[in-house]
């Protein structure tokens, strides 16, 4: 009920703070409109940026609430909704290669056919959807501090017969890299083999 859309100008003092925070994360007006980004100034989600996720039918299936101030003790506040879902499913074309990232800010930076895991491993619903839709190619782009998780995820996907590409994020998250540098890395990435995964486990 406290949600206010950020693509509409507001006299609320937090409006400017929210826009400033998003600009700092390279999120502009087009992204705000595309992802229906808003903010809250009251209730349990006060001072937070709200980024909703919608399923294939356009129904809300999750939302992320991120504090817009740097001194916050709790950066994220999870909603009373299950994470067993497919983030940003409304934007996904299952016939095309899919990119898997950790968070919504990573997904917004990547833009094209990308699913935020809302963690480091896919939900049961997402796994089911990948199998159902017979997804052929997946790019794994987890944050730099999750190398072992990325290796484990790549092995998991390969076991399902999915062509998997494990991206070397070069010490940055997708949201830190930005759109063009991320896609440059993606296009340079070669398909992962089982032997590569084993070596990765030994050296990661």
Provide a role label for each language-model segment:
Residues 1-50, 54-57, 92-93, 128-131, ...:
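TOPRIM metal-binding catalytic domain and adjacent DNA-binding surface shared by DnaG-type primases
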Residues 41-137:
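Phosphate-handling DNA/RNA-contact segment within nucleic-acid enzymes
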Residues 48-49, 131-135, 175-188:
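Short, surface-exposed amphipathic charged segments that create phosphate/polyanion-binding patches used
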Residues 100, 136-149:
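Acidic beta-strand-to-loop metal/phosphate-binding motif
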Residues 109-110, 125, 149-152, 174:
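Phosphate- and divalent-cation-binding pockets in alpha/beta enzyme and binding domains
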Residues 118-124, 142-145, 169-171:
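Short, acidic/turn-prone active-site loops that include or flank metal/cofactor-
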Residues 149-161:
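Short, aromatic/basic amphipathic alpha-helical patches
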Residues 163-173:
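A generic structural motif
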């Amino acid at each position: 009920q406290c949600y206010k859309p950020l693509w509409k100008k507001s006299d609320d003092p937090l409006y400017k703070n929210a826009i400033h925070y998003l600009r700092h994360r390279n999120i502009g007006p087009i992204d705000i409109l595309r992802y229906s980004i808003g903010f809250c100034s009251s209730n349990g989600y006060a001072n937070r940026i709200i980024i909703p996720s919608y399923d294939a039918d356009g129904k809300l299936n999750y939302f992320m609430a991120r504090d817009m101030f740097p001194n916050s003790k709790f950066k994220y506040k999870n909603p009373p909704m299950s994470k067993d879902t497919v983030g940003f499913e409304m934007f996904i074309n299952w016939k095309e290669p899919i990119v898997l990232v950790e968070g919504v800010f990573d997904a917004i930076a990547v833009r094209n056919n990308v699913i935020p895991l809302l963690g480091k491993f896919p939900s049961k619903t997402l796994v089911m959807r990948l199998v159902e839709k017979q997804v052929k190619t997946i790019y794994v782009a987890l944050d730099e501090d999750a190398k072992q998780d990325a290796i484990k995820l790549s092995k998991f996907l390969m076991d399902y017969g999915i062509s998997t590409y494990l991206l070397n994020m070069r010490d940055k998250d997708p949201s830190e890299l930005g759109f063009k540098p991320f896609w440059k890395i993606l296009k340079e990435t070669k398909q992962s083999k089982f032997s590569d995964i084993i070596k990765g486990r030994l050296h990661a």
